[in-house]
Amino acid sequence: MDQVMPIPNAVMKLLDLLPENATPYLVGGCVRDWLLGIAIKDFDIEVFNISMDKLIRILSKHGRTDTVGRSFGVIKWTPCKGETYDIAIPRKETKTGDGHQGFDIETDPQLDPRIAASRRDYTINSIMYDLRKHAIIDAFGGQSDLENRRLKHTSDAFSEDPLRVMRGVQFAARFGMCGDPATLELCRSIRNQFNQLPPERLWNEWYKWASQSRFPSKGLQFLAD
């Protein structure tokens, strides 16, 4: 595969807007889908070495910003007559309570990219793409897991959020993947915590399984395992 990712002009424009020391990465599903040869729906961006206030000031001069997600380190940026992009500052998460929302979130612009990637649920979602260098950053072997259709947790922090089990169900079904034995063991250890999750969050993952899966039985097998 050509390792230069096709990127919208509006996203590349960030390189001209941001200070030279600020490093923007594409993160999450867009990198995963590109590597799988799947059409990319959303480009999510994480910018290191810049404060949230400065990022908002810069982007507000070149489009509309929505700061409703600021407490989570995320803003939405809509360039003039363009699509909307989620742009985040790196963050650290500390488990403080039950369920999907029981976390204390602290943004840290100077966070090491490897540490930032470690909070992702599965290795296939931890792969980053450096927009300045046009280089893949794969600290946790996500590319190998994609090639081998292996669904593997990124770190032991996986067990802090039971929703990640159901995300695994729909990922397995969409991409034809099997659970890594250690990951399945972690899933079994938190399966009794589903009652901590809002029903709509569980439904959302089931909906993705039903509406987007090419291999629905793979998802059910992941859940059974």
Describe each model-derived feature in a short phrase:
Residues 1-225:
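Catalytic cores of the polymerase beta-like nucleotidyltransferase superfamily
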